[in-house]
Regions:
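Chromodomain-type histone methyl-lysine reader module
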Residues: 1-137, 141-148, 153, 240, ...
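Mobile genetic element proteins and their domesticated derivatives, centered on retroelements
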Residues: 1-2, 28, 70, 85, ...
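Active-site palm subdomain of RNA-directed nucleic acid polymerases
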Residues: 134-182, 186-191, 195-202, 295-306, ...
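RNase H-like nuclease module associated with reverse transcription
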Residues: 312-316, 383, 422-542
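A short, polar/acidic, helix/strand-boundary loop motif
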Residues: 51, 407-434
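Two-metal-ion RNase H-like nuclease active-site motif
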Residues: 24-30, 82-86, 380-397
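C-terminal reverse transcriptase regions that engage the nucleic-acid substrate
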Residues: 69-71, 204-351, 508, 518
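Catalytic palm subdomain of template-directed nucleic-acid polymerases
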Residues: 90-103, 122-127, 156-159, 163-198, ...
Length: 542
C-alpha cells in the first residue's frame, strides 16, 4: 500500500470534499499472475459509478501489425530490442476526474478518513487516457514524435556512432509495456526510468510480449531475426479449457486425444444442424473463440480460417460448433510449438514477371499519393509482397466466398486475413477480383504507415494471384471488362497498377501461400504451404 498511498490526498477532519467532487467506493482485487504464479493485490476505484469523460478514455495500444514491422526493421538495420514494464503505471499520472473516497482498513491508522483521488487509479474510466497523456508528454521531452499512422509508436532520428548511419529509433507502447528499438536501447530505458519507474526485473531483453515469447533467432542463412512464439499461451489456454470442461461442464464435452488438423476432414460448420447450445455452453464457446482469435493475432496463422468460420456463429452456436472448437484445441495441444519469424532478408523477385505498360490512355497521368508530412526516409528500404486468393461460394448456405491475404515486408509476414466476402459473387473470376481489391486497399494503408514510420519505400508492391483471367484483366491495359458488376474492383485494381503503387503477376495455386486462408487444407499440401510461413510447426515431418 506504500505505492498506492500517493494516489490520495487526505481531506482534513474539519473539512468536506470540494464542491463538484463525486464520492466513489474503492476495493481490493486479488489475483494470481499466470506468467510466474505470483500473488497480486491491487486497489481499484469504483469507476463504474462515474459518468464517462467527454474526452478519450483509451490507453496506449500499439497495433500488432506495427509491432511486426518494427521487429523486422530492428533486424534489418541491426538494432537492439529491449523491453521494460512501468511500475504501477496508472498512478504515475494525475487524475482527470473529480472524485473522492473513504479509505478502507488497508490504510491502517488512516482508515475511515475521506481522501481525494489525485492519481489515475485503476478502475477510473479516464485512467488509461491519463497515463497515455502523461507518457506522451515525457516522450516529447525526449524529442520522440508520435507516428500519425499509429499514435502509440514513437520515433526519433538517430545516428549510429560506429559508421554515422542515420536511422529511426522506435518506442512501442502497449499500455504499460514498453519496447525500445535503438542502437543503445538500454540507455533509452534508463532515461525513461528516471521519469517513469520501470520494474527492475523487466528491464533488458524481451521475454513475453503480447502473450507470446519474443526472442532472437539465428536462421539457416545466418541472419539474426526476431520471432514470436505463442506456445506458452497456447498450452495455458488448452489447460484452462480442460479444467473448465471438467469442473464447469461435467465432462459433457471433451478435447479429442488426437487431432492432426484443426477441423475433421468431413466437417463444415455452415451445414451443422446439431442442437443449439444452452446459455452456459454458449458463453464458453464465445470465450474459446476469443482466446483462439488472439492466438491468430500473435502468430497462429494455421488456425485462422477455422477460427474465422466458427466466429460467424457466436450468436447461435450449436453443439457441433463447440465440438469443432474443441477439435482445434486438440490440434493446438498436439501442435503447440510454432514461431513466426520476422526475417529481414530481401526476397528474390523476378521483375520480368511483372511487365510494365503505358496506362496513360486509360487513366491519364496518375501517380501514387505521397504523404506531404511524412518524415525523411532513413535506414534500409523494404520490399512488399502480397498473395491473394479466394474460395468461391465456400459457404454452403449463403454462397458467400472467402478471401485469403498474406502480406510480407521482405520475408517477414506482417499481415494475414481470412474473411468472408461481403457480396455474393456468381463466378470465381468475381470472387478473385473482390479479394484482390481488398488486398490493394490494405496495401495502400501499409505503404502509408511505412512512410509515416520513416521507412524508405520507392518501388511498387508486388501482388500475386492464381487466377489467370483476373490477373490479365488487372495487369494488361487493353483487357476489357465483360460484367459491369465487377467494375468497381476492376478499376480500383487497375488504377493502382497505373499509378505505380502495385504490379501484378500470376502464381500457380500450388505455390499460393494464401490458399490455406480461404479453405481448410489437409495432408501434404497443408504441411508444405504452412511450413513456409511458420517455423517448428511441422518439424516432426522433416
Amino acid at each position: 500500500m506504500r505505492e498506492v498511498r500517493k494516489a490520495f490526498e487526505i481531506i482534513p477532519d474539519d473539512q468536506t470534499a470540494p464542491i463538484g467532487y463525486q464520492k466513489i467506493p474503492c476495493h481490493m482485487v486479488f489475483d494470481i499472475k499466470m506468467e510466474d504464479f505470483k500473488r497480486k493485490a491491487r486497489l481499484v476505484a469504483g469507476g463504474h459509478k462515474t459518468e464517462a469523460p467527454a474526452t478519450i478514455t483509451y490507453a496506449s495500444v500499439v497495433s500488432r501489425e506495427t509491432v511486426r514491422i518494427a521487429l523486422m526493421l530492428a533486424a534489418l538495420n541491426d538494432l537492439q530490442v529491449k523491453a521494460g514494464d512501468v511500475l504501477n503505471a496508472y498512478i504515475t499520472a494525475p487524475c482527470k476526474e473529480k472524485v473522492w473516497t473513504v479509505l478502507g482498513p488497508e490504510f491502517g491508522s488512516e482508515a475511515g478518513k475521506g481522501a481525494i483521488i489525485v492519481r489515475a487509479l485503476y478502475g477510473l474510466k479516464s485512467a488509461g487516457a491519463a497515463f497515455r497523456a502523461h507518457l506522451a508528454s515525457f516522450m516529447r521531452q525526449m524529442n520522440y514524435t508520435s507516428c500519425k499512422a499509429d499514435p502509440d509508436l514513437w520515433y526519433k532520428a538517430e545516428t549510429r556512432p560506429d559508421d554515422d548511419t542515420r536511422y529511426y529509433a522506435y518506442i512501442l507502447v502497449y499500455v504499460d509495456d514498453i519496447l525500445c528499438i535503438h542502437h543503445d536501447a538500454m540507455s533509452v530505458l534508463d532515461r525513461i526510468n528516471e521519469c517513469l519507474p520501470l520494474k527492475p526485473q523487466s528491464m533488458g531483453d524481451p521475454d513475453i510480449y503480447l502473450g507470446a515469447k519474443l526472442r532472437e533467432t539465428r536462421l539457416p542463412n545466418g541472419v539474426w531475426a526476431w520471432g514470436l512464439s505463442p506456445s506458452k499461451y497456447v498450452n495455458q489456454a488448452v489447460q484452462n479449457c480442460q479444467t473448465h470442461l471438467t469442473k464447469k461442464l461435467g465432462g459433457t464435452f471433451k478435447i479429442p486425444a488426437k487431432a492432426a488438423n484443426p477441423f475433421p476432414e468431413s466437417y463444415s460448420p455452415d451445414t451443422d444442424m446439431t442442437d443449439p447450445l444452452d446459455p452456459e455452453c454458449s458463453s464458453f464457446f464465445q470465450h474459446l473463440i476469443g482466446v483462439m482469435r488472439w492466438m491468430v493475432e500473435i502468430g497462429r496463422v494455421d488456425i485462422a480460417v477455422e477460427v474465422s468460420m466458427l466466429s460467424s456463429y457466436l450468436t447461435l452456436p450449436r453443439e457441433g460448433h463447440l465440438e469443432a472448437a474443441l477439435h482445434i484445441m486438440g490440434y493446438l495441444k498436439q501442435k503447440h510449438n510454432s514461431r513466426l519469424i520476422f526475417d529481414p532478408t530481401y526476397p528474390l523477385i523476378d521483375e520480368s514477371d511483372f511487365p510494365e505498360h503505358d496506362w496513360t490512355e486509360f487513366y491519364g497521368d496518375v501517380s501514387e499519393a505521397i504523404p506531404h508530412d511524412m518524415p525523411e526516409p532513413l535506414g534500409k528500404e523494404v520490399d512488399i509482397r502480397m498473395m491473394t486468393d479466394s474460395d468461391h461460394a465456400g459457404c454452403k448456405t449463403t454462397r458467400r466466398s472467402r478471401t485469403g491475404i498474406l502480406i510480407f515486408c521482405n520475408l517477414a509476414l506482417i499481415q494475414w486475413i481470412s474473411k468472408r466476402q461481403p457480396t455474393i459473387e456468381t463466378s470465381v473470376f468475381g470472387a478473385e477480383f473482390v479479394a484482390m481489391k481488398h488486398g490493394i486497399e490494405i496495401l495502400r494503408g501499409l505503404r502509408y504507415k511505412l512512410r509515416m514510420m520513416g521507412v524508405p519505400l520507392t518501388g511498387p508492391s508486388f501482388v500475386y494471384g492464381d487466377n489467370k483471367s483476373q490477373v490479365t484483366n488487372c495487369s494488361v491495359p487493353e483487357s476489357t471488362l465483360k460484367k459491369k458488376s465487377h467494375s468497381i474492383c476492376y478499376h480500383a485494381i487497375r488504377e493502382s497498377v497505373a499509378m505505380g503503387e502495385t504490379r501484378i503477376t500470376h502464381i500457380s495455386t500450388g505455390d499460393n501461400l494464401a490458399d490455406p486462408l480461404t479453405k481448410c487444407t489437409f495432408g501434404a499440401k497443408r504441411r508444405r504451404l504452412l511450413g513456409n510461413i511458420l517455423y517448428d510447426l511441422y518439424d516432426d515431418f522433416n
